[in-house]
């Protein structure tokens, strides 16, 4: 589970660990999908499709202090979940961070 998570989290890439049935995950997907990401730099990882979902959530707990989804990573930094993403978006920090990372098309 640790290797799986670590293989997904990469500098310059936005990765969101999700469960498809979770409304907060869907909201997060909606927000991020509207932004002009460069190809391959936005990934949604469905942890229900893995055999070790609870181990993945345990590792996310270790890594980020919470095992709930969505867990949003901007590069190697976990910014939290859906409400954290919305707060960043409202302050204009989200676009700034994504531009800084080089994740968006010009």
Curated annotation (Swiss-Prot):
Cysteine disulfide partners in this protein: 22-25, 78-82
Function field: Has a glutathione-disulfide oxidoreductase activity in the presence of NADPH and glutathione reductase. Reduces low molecular weight disulfides and proteins.
Stated family: Belongs to the glutaredoxin family.
Modification sites for N-acetylalanine: 1
Superkingdom to which the source organism belongs: Eukaryota
Cellular component, GO annotation: mitochondrion
Keywords: Acetylation, Cytoplasm, Disulfide bond, Electron transport, Redox-active center, Transport
Name of the protein: Glutaredoxin-1
């Amino acid at each position: 589970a640790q290797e799986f998570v670590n293989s997904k989290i990469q500098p310059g890439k936005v990765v969101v660990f999700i469960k498809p049935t979770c409304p907060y995950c869907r909201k997060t997907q909606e927000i991020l999908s509207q932004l002009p990401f460069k190809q391959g730099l936005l990934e949604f990882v469905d942890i229900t499709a893995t055999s070790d979902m609870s181990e993945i959530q345990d590792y996310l707990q270790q890594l980020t202090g919470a095992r709930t989804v969505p867990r949003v990573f901007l590069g190697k930094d976990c910014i939290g979940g859906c409400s954290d993403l919305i707060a960043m978006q409202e302050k204009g920090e989200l676009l700034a961070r994504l531009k800084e990372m080089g994740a968006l098309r010009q």
